[in-house]
């Protein structure tokens, strides 16, 4: 299985890659891609796209998702993001709607969030792979152990990071983050089922930009 990951992450996570659970996870995932050709998302080379798109030291904002989109050609390894030629999913539509409302800007009608990642937004799903049409199909195979460790490493080794936790699943990660050195923003999930329960009107993006400015970090263009 081809895995692409940025060099600084390779160094930071090398101990994790050597652990027994991770080796078992890799073997499981390799077998899934081999036996279910074209049915596991994202493509192998994009599994670690969130890491490959952003060096560790350049992280400014962390947005946590659950697992990748499970439709064909949707998932591109970045939480909430889809390939540029794919229709924008409802949750991402609501994210754009909140950005436009709170920042008074016009978002680009393109669901590929690589443009955010390259500016310092770490778009991390807790589970990094999924089987077609089976949401959460790769739950409890080891990904959560790995990504929980990633969150703890960010919290421990960086300062003044904005963590956006949307929905009960993401909010459950709050205990992994040191609130004394980072900004934790919590609200409902941007899904159409819950966006009106807090997400729309949360002002998370304006709060994030204000926090970055207060800590002398360059702003992010959320268009």
UniProtKB/Swiss-Prot annotation:
Q: Which SMART domains does the annotation name?
A: UDG, UreE_C
Which CDD domains does the entry link to?
UDG-F1-like (cd10027)
Q: What is its EC number?
A: 3.2.2.27
The enzyme class is hydrolase
Function recorded in the entry: Excises uracil residues from the DNA which can arise as a result of misincorporation of dUMP residues by DNA polymerase or due to deamination of cytosine.
Gene Ontology molecular function: uracil DNA N-glycosylase activity
| Gene Ontology terms describing biological process | base-excision repair, AP site formation via deaminated base removal
From the UniProt record, list the reaction(s) this protein catalyses.
Hydrolyzes single-stranded DNA or mismatched double-stranded DNA and polynucleotides, releasing free uracil
The terms describing its cellular component in GO are: cytoplasm
Query: What is the superkingdom listed in this entry's lineage?
Result: Bacteria
Q: Which family does it belong to?
A: Belongs to the uracil-DNA glycosylase (UDG) superfamily. UNG family.
Where is the signal peptide, in residue numbers?
none
By what name is this protein known?
A: Uracil-DNA glycosylase
Cite the NCBIfam families for this sequence: PRK05254.1-1, PRK05254.1-2, PRK05254.1-4, PRK05254.1-5, ung
UniProt keyword annotations, A-Z: Cytoplasm, DNA damage, DNA repair, Hydrolase
The major lineage groups are: Bacteria, Pseudomonadati, Spirochaetota, Spirochaetia, Spirochaetales
- Identify one Pfam family in the record: UDG
PROSITE patterns associated with the record: U_DNA_GLYCOSYLASE
Q: Where in the cell is it found?
A: Cytoplasm
The answer to whether UniProt assigns keyword Hydrolase to this entry is: yes
Active site at 67 (proton acceptor)
List, alphabetically, the PANTHER family matched.
URACIL-DNA GLYCOSYLASE
Hydrolase is among the record's keywords: yes
